[in-house]
Amino acid sequence: MSKVIGITGGIATGKSTVSELLTAYGFKIVDADIASREAVKKGSKGLEQVKEIFGEEAIDENGEMNRQYVGEIVFNHPDLREALNEIVHPIVREIMEQEKNNYLEHGYHVIMDIPLLYENELQDTVDEVWVVYTSESIQIDRLMERNNLSLEDAKARVYSQISIDKKSRMADHVIDNLGDKLELKQNLQKLLEEEGYIQSESE
């Protein structure tokens, strides 16, 4: 029977890498970040609603959403973040639901890659939750390098979410990503073997 698994974690814990690895095992990925971009793509109703709230500056010269401009505003103004979420979230849910149902109809196991799964209380929409774990210090280091952020800004992003330790305690399974990509792959393979998704290579 097909399963729906929610993959989550904290910012820069390695969720996307885990999703990428899972595709090699035949899982189908429904990515909340991709759906979010689809929800406000050029010419969409969602983008038009964003412009109504955030003004012309919210649209760049290519007719796309100016993510940096909108991101800076909502990071510092919770009321506007809530307004943006009210526009985007229903559209994202509809896109993801359609993708998920399409994969389930064809008998695939589905991974719902949702960074804010616990923050948005979506754990009941999946059969299991797998959390990708790394330490907060590694999260901060990765963010500083990947996004070219200051230490202060990186910490602010990490601490704006439910802590990775708390998410790990709530999860059905935790995937350790404290090491390199090879170790992550080995940890993921072990979980898939234990849960019966793949056969052990020793069998």
Swiss-Prot record:
Residues 4-203 form the DPCK domain. Its EC number is 2.7.1.24. GO terms for molecular function: ATP binding; dephospho-CoA kinase activity. One of its GO terms (cellular component) is cytoplasm. The keyword ATP-binding applies. ATP binds at A12, T13, G14, K15, S16, T17. The keyword Kinase applies. It is an enzyme of class 2 (transferase). CDD domains: DPCK. Pathway: Cofactor biosynthesis; coenzyme A biosynthesis; CoA from (R)-pantothenate: step 5/5. GO terms for biological process: coenzyme A biosynthetic process. Catalyzes the phosphorylation of the 3'-hydroxyl group of dephosphocoenzyme A to form coenzyme A. Belongs to the CoaE family. This is Dephospho-CoA kinase.
